[in-house]
């Protein structure tokens, strides 16, 4: 209807656990390699009119098992040098259409509710000009669509905080 297609990729998470069920979607354990590959894919995909990429899962979502329940404790240095560097490279060199936030928490804050990640880092520091979207069913009012709505150790991100943090779209969207 809108004649815009968004490829829900590339996945840019870092290979940290060989048992991660989605490592096949991610490029590398090296954030430089991940960033350069994602930027190349983004430029190629977005060279076609009306098609964009969604770099994901922003950020530090490096395990598939338990990813909706995990609170990653990461130092500022490790966050910037390992977990954000690939995203920074992709944004600065290719300007993807969208960034998708992840389900996990980083240092006690849901990534979808993190102003530090979505606005301060992505938009203000790196110059991201696209839109930010949540992963599917991340926020409380979208959770009823999915089986994992119950027994979340840290609860859901909230719609209000999603908007205040810098999300432009909560997925799945509705007409």
Report residues per predicted region.
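Glycoside hydrolase catalytic-domain context in secreted enzymes
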Residues: 1-175
């Amino acid at each position: 209807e809108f004649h815009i297609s968004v490829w829900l990729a590339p996945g840019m998470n870092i290979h940290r656990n060989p048992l991660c069920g989605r490592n096949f979607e991610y490029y590398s354990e090296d954030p430089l390699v991940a960033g350069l590959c994602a930027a190349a894919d983004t430029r190629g995909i977005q060279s076609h009119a009306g098609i964009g990429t969604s770099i994901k899962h922003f950020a530090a979502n490096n395990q598939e098992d338990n990813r909706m329940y995990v609170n990653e404790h990461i130092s500022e240095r490790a966050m910037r040098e390992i977990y954000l560097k690939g995203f920074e490279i992709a944004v600065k060199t290719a300007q993807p259409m969208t960034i998708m936030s992840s389900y996990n928490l980083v240092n006690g804050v849901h990534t979808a509710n993190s102003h530090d990640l979505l606005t301060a880092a992505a938009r203000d520091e790196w110059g991201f000009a696209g839109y930010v979207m949540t992963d599917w069913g991340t926020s409380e009012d979208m959770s009823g669509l999915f089986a994992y709505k119950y027994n979340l150790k840290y609860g859901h991100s909230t719609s209000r905080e999603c908007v205040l943090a810098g999300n432009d779209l909560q997925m799945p969207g509705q007409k």
